[in-house]
Amino acid sequence: GLGDVYKRQWDRTYRTPGEPLDTVMPMAVLINGASASAAEIVSGSLQDMDRAVLIGQRSFGKGLVQSPRELPYNGSVKVTMSKYYIPSGRCIQQMDYSHRKADGSVGAIPDSLTSVFYTSKGRPVRDGGGITPDFKIEEPETPTMMFYLVTDFLLTDFVAEWSQKHKKIAPPEDFEVTDEDFEAFKQYAKEKNFTYDRQSEKLLKNLKEVAKFEGYMDNDSTIFNSLEAKLTPDLDRDFDRNKDQIKKLLTSEIMKRYYFQKGELINSLKEDDVLDKALEVLGDPALYQQTLEAPGKVEKTATL
């Protein structure tokens, strides 16, 4: 039909200049929420063809193609022209721009409206939400306090002073922040009168207002007072509670100052749950093959 003719006009076939170097070597691809567009197409295609295992967190979900168009008075606009589809037939787009809410905002495609597709060996995969890894490694929650440590430049300023007392440090693969360094940073935060908001404290304030409006405050005020005491920021307590994450932030800042981005990356690989899982899977041929096998018979699989 006419539609097929139109589609063929836009078909493009690209070929590599030579034969592939290796078609059987086990591969693991690390992805997370920052993996978008081309990264998702490559990782998703490898998953669809059962050529690699994917490890990490769900990818971003950018499956639309935009083309810029010139406008008068040196203006320009990007127009969505097409969508990305990968070998199984699924689209990786997460945000549904075809259906807008009353206020004009858009939301992600709910899981209930996604469809099942199949890899070349028959493994079920879904569309509409980026690429879901074969092994999910959840990232730890980041407390609000961490955000303020970075945005208030407290880390940067402390490391600038710290570096004046430490002209040389261990190489990236060996360096570790000591407990003494951690305590020094905590003391520095106190001296600089470091303050931070906590979402739990704000939510409690809203809850108290609702309880007062509904008449519960008079009978249960002691409960709210107890909660308020527990949720009031306490620098010593919160520093100690988040010690491991704060030490990681310190380490990252120190590495960037002494060894730049390369050193920071080398050091971070010492404690990387996603990388550790990749090494585990690649080191276990049985687990690797089992991951790529289909759970049962299916009707249609991915093809190139």
Residue ranges and their predicted role:
Residues V24-M27, A39-S43, Q47, A52, ...:
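Extracytoplasmic/secreted envelope proteins and their assembly/folding machinery
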